[in-house]
């Protein structure tokens, strides 16, 4: 669980930015996006190999 301490006088925008930054760092949003819809194992496997090829081409 992510907690962001807000001091007296801090703006809500600053607190929201800090929360978003912490969630991105922990990978929460990425996992929510990945589990939003069911994807078949074959599609996961295909995406994984495609990412590996992309990474290999960069190196």
From Swiss-Prot:
Gene Ontology, cellular component aspect: ribonucleoprotein complex; ribosome
Biological process according to GO: translation
Protein name (Swiss-Prot/TrEMBL): Small ribosomal subunit protein bS21
Keyword Ribosomal protein listed: yes
UniProt keywords, alphabetically: Ribonucleoprotein, Ribosomal protein
GO terms of molecular function: structural constituent of ribosome
Gene3D superfamilies cross-referenced by the UniProt entry: Ribosomal protein S8
Matches recorded under InterPro entries: Ribosomal_bS21, Ribosomal_bS21_CS, Ribosomal_bS21_sf
Primary gene name: rpsU
Location of the region described as Disordered in the Swiss-Prot/TrEMBL record: 40-59
Keyword Heme: no
């Amino acid at each position: 669980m992510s907690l962001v301490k807000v001091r007296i006088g801090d703006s809500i925008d600053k607190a929201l930015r800090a929360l978003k930054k912490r969630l991105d760092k922990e990978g929460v949003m990425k996992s929510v996006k990945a589990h939003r819809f069911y994807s078949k194992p074959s599609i996961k496997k295909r995406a994984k190999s495609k990412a590996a090829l992309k990474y290999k081409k960069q190196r």
